[in-house]
């Protein structure tokens, strides 16, 4: 989150309540995920998803994404929770959804994955720094390959694209405009003012 968090004053009867903007938006079932995806952010998003499900398991949850990506395991924890809970999770890209951010964008409920017009989306294969003994490097390399296959399997199912094409596109950074992402199947619509 940010160092300076705006507050909102809500007037109810004779009382005033001050909320930080994120808590106020959470009351409207809106979650923000911005910046690098890590374990701390994943824990926060997962807690918010579970809380909103307990509040009303039939109303959609809105997950706004502006992320360059991050930890695969943290992203998979968020994705698993999105698929586990009963409410549909609408995903909306604002700014960018790259790497694990794009994976989460595509992981929204089918028909409810959206982007603002000038956002950018980027997919690529998992990467990580490996060091240590030769046997440890081999173990880590095998795990990265396993995660790559898992991400491709999940994404190809989620967006309805051939696994081989997706794997080929993910070999290098593959940038898309919102229109490109719509054609690709990563999103279902582009949000514009009516």
From Swiss-Prot:
GO molecular function, one term: ATPase binding
Keyword check for rRNA-binding: no
Localization (cell): Cytoplasm
One GO BP: protein quality control for misfolded or incompletely synthesized proteins
Reactions it catalyzes: Hydrolysis of proteins to small peptides in the presence of ATP and magnesium. alpha-casein is the usual test substrate. In the absence of ATP, only oligopeptides shorter than five residues are hydrolyzed (such as succinyl-Leu-Tyr-|-NHMec, and Leu-Tyr-Leu-|-Tyr-Trp, in which cleavage of the -Tyr-|-Leu- and -Tyr-|-Trp bonds also occurs)
InterPro entries: ClpP (IPR001907), ClpP/crotonase-like_dom_sf (IPR029045), ClpP/TepA (IPR023562), ClpP_His_AS (IPR033135), ClpP_Ser_AS (IPR018215)
Keywords: Cytoplasm, Hydrolase, Protease, Serine protease
SUPFAM superfamilies: ClpP/crotonase
One Pfam family named in its UniProt record: CLP_protease
Active site: 99 (nucleophile), 124
Documented EC number(s): 3.4.21.92
Entry GO terms, CC: cytoplasm; endopeptidase Clp complex
Subunit organization: Fourteen ClpP subunits assemble into 2 heptameric rings which stack back to back to give a disk-like structure with a central cavity, resembling the structure of eukaryotic proteasomes.
Function: Cleaves peptides in various proteins in a process that requires ATP hydrolysis. Has a chymotrypsin-like activity. Plays a major role in the degradation of misfolded proteins.
Similarity field: Belongs to the peptidase S14 family.
Name assigned to this protein: ATP-dependent Clp protease proteolytic subunit
């Amino acid at each position: 989150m940010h160092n300076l968090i705006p507050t909102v004053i809500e007037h109810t009867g004779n009382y005033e309540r001050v909320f930080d903007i994120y808590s106020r938006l959470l009351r409207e079932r809106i979650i923000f995920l911005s910046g690098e995806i890590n374990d701390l952010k994943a824990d926060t998003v997962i807690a918010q998803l579970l809380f909103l499900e307990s509040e009303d398991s039939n109303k959609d949850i809105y997950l706004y994404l502006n992320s360059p990506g991050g930890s695969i395991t943290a992203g998979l924890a968020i994705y698993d929770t999105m698929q586990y809970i009963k409410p549909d999770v609408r995903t909306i890209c604002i700014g960018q959804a790259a790497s694990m951010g794009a994976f989460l964008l595509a992981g929204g409920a089918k028909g409810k994955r959206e982007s603002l017009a000038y956002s950018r989306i980027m997919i690529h294969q998992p990467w990580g720094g490996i060091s240590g003994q030769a046997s440890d490097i081999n173990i880590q390399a095998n795990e990265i390959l396993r995660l790559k296959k898992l991400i491709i399997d999940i994404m190809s199912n989620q967006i309805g694209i051939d696994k081989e094409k997706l794997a080929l596109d993910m070999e290098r950074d593959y940038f898309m405009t919102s229109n490109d992402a719509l054609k690709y199947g990563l999103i279902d619509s582009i949000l514009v003012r009516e």
